[in-house]
Amino acid sequence: VHMTDAEKKLVTTMWGKLDVDAAGAETLGRVLVVYPWTQRFFGHFGDLSSACAVMDNPKVQAHGKKVLHSLGDGLNHLDDLKHFYAALSELHCDKLHVDPENFRLLGNVLVCVMSRHFGAEFTPQVQAAYQKVVAGVANALAHKYH
């Protein structure tokens, strides 16, 4: 991902203020509610029958935390996301058969969640920087599909 030093600073500063566990749980929960067809990859998570069931599901919350911690780790590798996420891309492509569009959906939902959490502090400049990050991560995760 091509980012200026100023954009990288915006991203890391906001990430440092984010409750990653809560944001991860909310992000994955929202993906599963807003895009219900994504639930097919999480049948082993138990009850996903309603928005409340999804948002309160401990397995959804735990996996959302895991996903966002991985994204946070990727922030240290913005110049080489494809290499950093190569193993995860292979796992999601070859073993889990996840539709790569889901990575884009999750990234966009994360941006919405961050906007909600940070309010006015999530300026258009911060949003633009995060859109670059989530697009870069989605592309890296989809890399093995090509």
UniProtKB/Swiss-Prot annotation:
Q: Which organism is it from?
A: Echinops telfairi
* CDD domains associated with the record: Hb-beta-like
> Which cellular component terms (GO) are annotated to the entry?
blood microparticle; haptoglobin-hemoglobin complex; hemoglobin complex
Positions where S-nitrosocysteine occurs in the chain: C93
Where in this chain does the record put each Globin domain? 2-146
InterPro entries attached here? Answer: Globin (IPR000971), Globin-like_sf (IPR009050), Globin/Proto (IPR012292), Hemoglobin_b (IPR002337), Hemoglobin_oxygen_transport (IPR050056)
Family assignment? Belongs to the globin family.
Q: State the tissue distribution.
A: Red blood cells.
Q: What's one GO MF term for it?
A: oxygen carrier activity
Q: Mark the residues carrying the PTM N6-acetyllysine.
A: K59, K82, K144
As stated in the Swiss-Prot or TrEMBL entry, residues carrying the post-translational modification N-acetylvaline are: V1
Q: How does it assemble?
A: Tetramer of two alpha and two different beta chains. Two external cysteine residues at beta-16 and beta-52 cause reversible polymerization to octamers and most likely irreversible formation of higher polymers.
Question: Which residues hold heme b?
Answer: H63, H92
Q: What is this protein called?
A: Hemoglobin subunit beta
Protein role? Involved in oxygen transport from the lung to the various peripheral tissues.
- Phosphothreonine modification sites are T12
**GO term, biological process aspect, one:** hydrogen peroxide catabolic process
Gene coding for it: HBB
Under the heading PROSITE patterns, the entry gives: GLOBIN
Q: Which Pfam families match?
A: Globin
Q: Which keywords does this Swiss-Prot/TrEMBL entry list?
A: Acetylation, Heme, Iron, Metal-binding, Oxygen transport, Phosphoprotein, S-nitrosylation, Transport
